[in-house]
Amino acid sequence: MANKSKLAKQKQREKTVEKYAAKRAELKAAGDYYGLTQLPRDASPTRLHNRCEFTGRPRGYVRFFGVSRIVLREMAHRGELPGVKKASW
């Protein structure tokens, strides 16, 4: 489980990105790069990091399911992911 502080920081960044999304798009379309530098750093979507929905783990994230590889494996073994089964060849 990730630190609560890391998860809180991520949530705050998501809110900031959402808040400034329209303003950023407007400045980028106008080519006003100085204006972009005046926005908060966390307003940039590149500062966001995909995290597991259940554990908050930032590494080993499987985008299709929105969880880490570890949680994906556990859920697949429990049969909570329809259509997913253990590979055998």
Swiss-Prot record:
Alphabetical UniProt keywords: Ribonucleoprotein, Ribosomal protein, RNA-binding, rRNA-binding
Pfam families, per the entry: Ribosomal_S14
Molecular function terms from GO: rRNA binding; structural constituent of ribosome
Gene Ontology CC terms, in alphabetical order: cytoplasm; small ribosomal subunit
Record bears the keyword rRNA-binding: yes
GO biological process: one example: translation
Function of the protein: Binds 16S rRNA, required for the assembly of 30S particles and may also be responsible for determining the conformation of the 16S rRNA at the A site.
Subunit structure: Part of the 30S ribosomal subunit. Contacts proteins S3 and S10.
Record-stated family: Belongs to the universal ribosomal protein uS14 family.
Protein name (Swiss-Prot/TrEMBL): Small ribosomal subunit protein uS14
Annotated organism of origin: Deinococcus radiodurans (strain ATCC 13939 / DSM 20539 / JCM 16871 / CCUG 27074 / LMG 4051 / NBRC 15346 / NCIMB 9279 / VKM B-1422 / R1)
